[in-house]
Amino acid sequence: MGVLEQIDQKELLALTGKNVEWLKPHSEGKYISVSLDVSDEFIHYVIDNDVNVSVVYSFCEQEDTQLWIGLPNLYYAGGTLTDKLISGELNKKNVDSYGLKLALFSQWDGKQDKAYSESLPYHFTSYNLISEPMSVCFSIQAVGMVNGTKSEVVKIPKTEFVFK
């Protein structure tokens, strides 16, 4: 993967091709660092502890199908965790304190289908945030949708979250 760089909102939009107006900076005005190697289907996010945003990236190649990765908000004080949907709606999950979870969402035709996203074969994985900095690596697989019909399984070989 390439060298990680601090990027602003416009640069992130150029990388992902998606509207990221809902992306908010943390207290110091910096944005999440992102490095994408689409050819290898690698997605790499680096966030600071005080970042309170969600970032999504489409990894499904079909034009009429988009599968999204949602990065949850982390709250260290009180030990609570929430998953923030693309729409900005908070979807609270019952998770252990100081945990990390990955959520998969489906979206097509510019609208999120919550009914289908609820039925997606989620691979929710929790990790304890024990030490900092830390790196969490895992693989993801999800069922795609084409014209409302389930299609082949889409795999991401590696997704890495690095907290520093």
Predicted regions and their residues:
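N-terminal export/targeting and maturation segments
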Residues: 1-78, 148-164
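Short, solvent-exposed, Trp/other aromatic-anchored flexible loops in extracytoplasmic proteins
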Residues: 72-150
